[in-house]
From Swiss-Prot:
UniProt GO MF annotations: abscisic acid binding; protein phosphatase inhibitor activity; signaling receptor activity
Gene3D superfamilies, A to Z: 3.30.530.20
GO CC field: cytoplasm; nucleus
Keyword annotations: Pathogenesis-related protein, Plant defense
InterPro entries: Bet_v_I/MLP, Bet_v_I_allergen, Plant_def-hormone_signal, START-like_dom_sf
Gene Ontology terms: biological process: abscisic acid-activated signaling pathway; defense response
Entry's family note: Belongs to the BetVI family.
SUPFAM superfamilies linked: Bet v1-like (SSF55961)
Pfam families: Bet_v_1
Protein name per UniProt: ABA-responsive protein ABR18
Length: 158
């Protein structure tokens, strides 16, 4: 198995505690409202904490696809969230899983800085397809910004 690591940083004007709550604890409700392609997020097993497996159903290229999202760790005090995409028909055949390590920090002017480490665990000695990696980064950035926009548009969100 090969492991290929990529890092991505982003910023937000939303404070870390509020953004973490939206991205981690309320995302199952927010995401289908703010991302047209994502139709449902359902818990298949667990209670939302580590070990929970979620099914994200989305439409891409006119096809209904899904991925299985496994929660690995949540640390509310440190604003850390680790999860993996562990299966589904929306994941490349050469990928065993994709692991994400996300952390929010205090940013300038009361906002946040987000750091994401993404690890592609490939089958055998296969390398991730660069186009798929770039598309994944773009989708992740768009998802983050959509949740941020929801929080900003709903000032009473807590």
């Amino acid at each position: 198995m090969g492991v290929f690591t990529y890092e991505n940083d982003t910023t937000s004007t939303v404070p870390p505690a509020k953004l973490f709550k939206a991205v981690v604890h309320d995302a199952d409700l927010i995401v289908p409202k703010v991302v047209d392609s994502i139709k449902t997020v359902e818990i298949l097993e667990g209670n939302g904490g580590p070990g929970t497996v979620k099914k994200l159903t989305f439409v891409e290229g006119g096809q209904t696809l899904y991925v299985l999202h496994k929660v690995e760790a949540i640390d509310d005090a440190k604003f850390e969230y680790n999860y993996s995409i562990v299966g589904g028909v929306g994941i490349s055949d050469i990928v065993e899983k994709i692991s994400f390590e996300a952390k929010l920090f205090e940013g300038p002017n009361g906002g946040s800085v987000g750091k994401m480490i993404v690890k592609y665990h490939t089958k055998g000695d296969a390398k991730p397809i660069e186009k798929e990696v770039e598309e994944g980064k773009a989708k992740g950035d768009a998802l983050f910004k959509a949740i941020e926009a929801y929080v900003l548009a709903n000032p009473n969100y807590n």
